Amino acid sequence: MSQIVVCAMYKFVTLEDFEAMRQPLLDTMIKNNVKGTLLLANEGINGTVAGTRESIDNLLAYLKSDPRLVDIDYKESYHQEMPFYRSKVKLKKEIVTLGVDEIDPNKICGKYVEPKDWNDLISDPETVLIDTRNEYEIEIGTFKNAINPHTENFREFPQYVDENLDPKKHKKVAMFCTGGIRCEKSTALLKAKGFDEVYHLKGGILKYLEEVPKEKSMWQGECFVFDSRVAVNHDLEKGNYDQCFACRMPITEDDKKRPEYVKGISCHHCYDKVTEKQKARFAEREKQSQLAAEKGFSHIGDEAKKLAQLNKQKKQQAKEAARKKTEKN
C-alpha cells in the first residue's frame, strides 16, 4: 500500500457557524500536514485532502468530534506522491455550485443506492441513467448506457434538466458522479421539479470502483479526479491520463504527440483558444517549474516558498559580494 492516503469527503448538513469553523479546521490540517482543499458553507462540507495514514485519521477524528459530522461520507484511495501543494479551507455559498436557490439536499433528495445494488438499477430498461459530471470527465470514462448531458460545469445541469427531462415521461431517474455530492444535489433538484423515483449512487463512482469487482463492473474507462493523478483506474490507482496545464483537460500519451501539444503551454483542446500572451505566461511558468524541479523543489506551495527564500538569499549574497569587491577596488 502506498504511503499517501487521498481522502474525498462531503456531507450535506446545516452548519450555521461554518465561518467560525474555518480557522480551527485549517489549523488542524496544517498541524497534521494534511494538504488539499475543504469547502465550508451553510449547507455542509466538501473537499479532497491527502496525507499520511495517521494524518488523515487525525483529521477525520477532529471532524467527527462535531456531532453534525460524525457520519461524514468519505472515500479513500492511495498514491505514491502528495497530489496537493497547499492546505486550504474556503468559505462558499454552496459546497458544490448548482446556482439554484432553495435547493437543499438536507430537506429533500433522492434515494441512495448502494454500489452492490447499482448494476441491477441501471440494467432496468425503465431507468434513465444520467452522468452529472462535466464533458471532459465523461470523455475518459462513464457507466454503460449513461446519458452525457454535455455540460461544461455543474451550473449548466439545471438547464439540461429543463430542456430534456419530463417527470411525466421519465418516471425513474438514476444519477451518479465522482464522489456522490453532485448527484445528491441533482436529485434534490429533480425532486423539487416533481420527479418521483429519483436515485443516486451512494459514495459515487469511487465507492463503486472500490466495492464492485472488475468482472462484475459496468464501469467503462477511467475516473477523472481533481488532483495531480488526473484519473484513476478500476483499482483506484493512477490511470493513463496526464493533464494539460494550460486548460486542465485530460490528455493521453498519443495526445502529447500531436503538433498542438507543447508541455505546460497548450494541447489540442486549447491550442486555438489560448492567446499569445497566455502562451508566453504559461511558458514562463513551465520554465520556473523546470528550474524548481532541477533543484528538488515544487514551483508552488510550501516548497516554492523555500525556493524563493533561497533565491532571495543568493541574490543578497551576490550583491554583498559585489559591494565588497567594489570597496576593495
Curated annotation (Swiss-Prot):
Residues 310-329 are annotated as: Disordered. Keywords: Oxidoreductase, tRNA processing. Residues 123-217 form the Rhodanese domain. PROSITE patterns: RHODANESE_3 (PS50206). Pfam families: Rhodanese (PF00581), UPF0176_N (PF17773). The active site is at C177. GO terms for biological process: tRNA modification. Residues 317-329 have a biased composition (Basic and acidic residues). One of its GO terms (molecular function) is oxidoreductase activity, acting on paired donors, with incorporation or reduction of molecular oxygen. The keyword Oxidoreductase applies. It catalyses: uridine(34) in tRNA + AH2 + O2 = 5-hydroxyuridine(34) in tRNA + A + H2O. Catalyzes oxygen-dependent 5-hydroxyuridine (ho5U) modification at position 34 in tRNAs. This is tRNA uridine(34) hydroxylase. It comes from Francisella tularensis subsp. novicida (strain U112). The lineage of its organism: Bacteria, Pseudomonadati, Pseudomonadota, Gammaproteobacteria, Thiotrichales. The gene is trhO.
